[in-house]
Amino acid sequence: MASNTSEFGAVQIAGRLAVPAERLDAPVDRVRCVLRCGKRYLLAQHNSRRRENIGKWGLPGGRLKSREEPRAALRRELIEELGLRVQSLVEIGDWWHRGENHRVFGCDVGQATQSFAPDELLAIDWFQYSEVVGLEADGHLRTGFELDAITAFRVRFPRVERATSTRRRPGAARTRAKRQRP
């Protein structure tokens, strides 16, 4: 899904306002990442000082350091929070939350990590898309843009699911049983 501009001049992603028009040139304050493993998406419960965020799920990531580029900041945050090194990051878009510009990237990972830094995060879990929809409906998402970011990533960067086939793959060994002779 491509982003477009509403009649009010604000950018829309996944049908909702992402960054108000007057903030389009705002510097990036925080970075977040949609991590996808197969059909599941990683959400984290951050170690937050804000009472309203306790127990809520959000995308991994954090604040940029002085003069740090967004991609470098996200790579650093993913190592700090999850011990995860990622190579390929695609930019999904920017979202405005609590007076800060959050740049969101997406990445497919081959294995669902279960490790995290307890000083940074309280918990992590991998959710099906329908479960993320339910978390939003129940008010259990931290910033309110998690579902929009995941939706934008799914639509703009669909993962090709492997179809099961009965045909033999090139180079694969044949497994036909030999006929027994009487």
Predicted regions and their residues:
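Active-site beta-strand termini and strand-to-loop segments that position acidic
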Residues: 35-38, 107-109
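Unchanged
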Residues: 62-146, 178
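Acidic, metal-coordinating catalytic segment for phosphate/diphosphate chemistry
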Residues: 2-32
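A generic fold-level signal
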Residues: 26-28, 36, 51-52, 99, ...
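Nudix hydrolase/Nudix homology domain
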Residues: 50, 54, 118-182
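Conserved Nudix-box catalytic region and its N-terminal flanking loop in Nudix hydrolases
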Residues: 36-80
